């Protein structure tokens, strides 16, 4: 019963009441298994009521570790997944505000404000934080943050160009973004790609770099979104997507001779993709 009093106070974000209920619980049941977790949550709530002072670079990682490794597990264990995530959001928001002045550091990217805003559930603030990073569209971490924020704020259609660029730039980061989003369509399309496309002569190229080109073969209706991806490093996967977009245009226009020549170029670029394309014809 006293544990429930602590939990109720925590959910109300009443730090004083939580502290009093926790003290009563400790007095009556000093070996209660939830004491350590409840103490962690009460302390976190008390600290969140203090002024949110900017983080110095040396403070950033310890502050993130405290919230990520101690407070968050305690909240999920004691409050449950739904209430726990909702309870944690203001704490992530406070940490994001404190990290706002920290520059992007590729070696410590997790302590930038953008991923903290994502964890707080503020997609617009996450986008704004990413836009403050120079050349963010050429760096895997901020490109992934922007793709996630854009998808959550505006839907998957708005994020397709960013996801394409991420596939070309850093396949593992794309996989991480897809896992974080939990979008059924995105997960299904990635799974289908893994199940159906043989890398063929291009085993040295990261497999997910070919996903955008395969995606256009499998889902040609996505062409208006995929073609908005910005030019990258002119890699073979990027050239293949552009070529497939050209092929779809030639088909619509009935330009047979040019279509045959473009198909030959596709076959030379990636035989397995060419075979997948021809199967759909």
Pin down the residues of each PLM region:
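Short, charge-rich amphipathic alpha-helical segments embedded
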Residues: 15-51, 135-144, 148
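Structural signature of alpha-solenoid helical repeat scaffolds
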Residues: 27, 55, 59, 101-102, ...
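Alpha-helical solenoid scaffolds that mediate protein-protein interactions
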Residues: 24-25, 66-70, 74, 94-98, ...
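Generic helix N-cap/helix-start motif at coil->alpha-helix transitions
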Residues: 1-3, 31, 63-74, 102-111, ...
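Charged, helix-prone or intrinsically disordered regulatory segments positioned adjacent to compact structured domains
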Residues: 42-86, 163, 179-184
């Amino acid at each position: 019963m006293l544990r429930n009093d602590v939990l109720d106070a925590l959910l109300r974000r009443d730090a004083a009441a939580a502290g009093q209920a926790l003290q009563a619980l400790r007095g009556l049941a000093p070996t209660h298994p939830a004491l350590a977790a409840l103490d962690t949550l009460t302390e976190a709530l008390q600290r969140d009521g203090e002024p949110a002072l900017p983080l110095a670079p040396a403070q950033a990682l310890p502050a993130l570790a405290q919230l990520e490794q101690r407070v968050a597990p305690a909240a999920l264990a004691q409050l449950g997944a739904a209430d726990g995530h909702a309870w944690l959001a203001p704490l992530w928001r406070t940490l994001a505000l404190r990290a706002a002045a920290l520059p992007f550091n590729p070696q410590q990217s997790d302590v930038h404000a953008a991923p903290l805003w994502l964890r707080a559930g503020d997609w617009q603030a996450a986008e704004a934080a990413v836009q403050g990073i120079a050349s963010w569209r050429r760096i895997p971490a901020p490109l992934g943050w922007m793709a996630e924020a854009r998808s959550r704020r505006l839907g998957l259609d708005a994020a397709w160009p960013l996801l394409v660029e991420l596939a070309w730039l850093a396949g593992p980061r794309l996989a991480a973004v897809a896992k974080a989003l939990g979008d059924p369509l995105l997960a299904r399309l990635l799974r289908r790609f893994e199940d159906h496309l043989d890398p063929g002569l291009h085993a040295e190229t990261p497999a997910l770099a070919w996903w955008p080109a395969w995606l256009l073969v499998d889902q040609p209706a996505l062409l208006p979104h995929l073609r908005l991806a910005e030019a990258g490093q002119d890699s073979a996967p990027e050239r293949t997507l552009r070529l497939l977009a050209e092929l779809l245009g030639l088909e619509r226009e009935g330009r047979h001779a040019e279509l045959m020549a473009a198909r030959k170029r596709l076959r030379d670029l990636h035989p397995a993709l060419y075979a997948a394309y021809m199967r759909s014809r």
